[in-house]
Amino acid sequence: IRMMTKDHEYLYPYSAQEAKKRNQLPMWRESYHANVACRKAIEETVRQNFDGMHLKKDCLEPVLAEYGYKRTEWVLATTLQELSWDGRFSRANKQWAARRYIPQDERHNAEITVRSHPAILDGFVDLYREAYQKLGLFGPEHCVGDRAEQDYIGKVLVLSPDTLKESFWSQENQLWYAHDGFGCSPHAIGRSVRCTCLSDGEMTRWNRDEFVGVLDEKFLPDWAKESLSQFQQEESAESPGMNNQSM
């Protein structure tokens, strides 16, 4: 796995209630305060960079530099989910926000709801989505099949950007070849998948739910095709030997 940019403070993915159950309230609190600070930074950058007609294109950069993509997305998605009744947000942006799981937490979610004018904030969401798109990361739209029913053995899997720190965000760090493990089976209780990174050959275990799904072959980059055929050759060379031993 190769590192790209700096790391940002950990984004805690559960509600305060869930954090209490898990005995993780300090982690939740730290992340929540950062979410509120990110909300205020968005409000400030929108205020400073809107000239009455247009929002400056580069107004997103200081927010991303300070808070990162994950937290910025969390705050924007929470805002659009909280204000889903507001017709000033585009349908496309509302649908985008709805795809992001935000835990129910009425009081705290209200605190991270951006208070900028919705029509201007909608433009800010557009800028964020464009910036994320330019990163060229793999997502559910690059995967095939029904994740709930798929067997992962021998497949190229897409590691979720949520699983990786932002400093490791790249296609090279997302593509993994699944060897075995209980997590390869959709209905097993065990979740672990033993796999190898196609770009650098690092072998490790990830949990099944840390993957977005199985990559559609048409999106497989050339550099990954070589590694993949090498793994497939090695595995097919190993399997006849194993069959002979069992006879």
What are these regions (language model features)?
Residues I1-S246:
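Gram-negative host-targeted secretion-system effectors, predominantly Type III and Type IV
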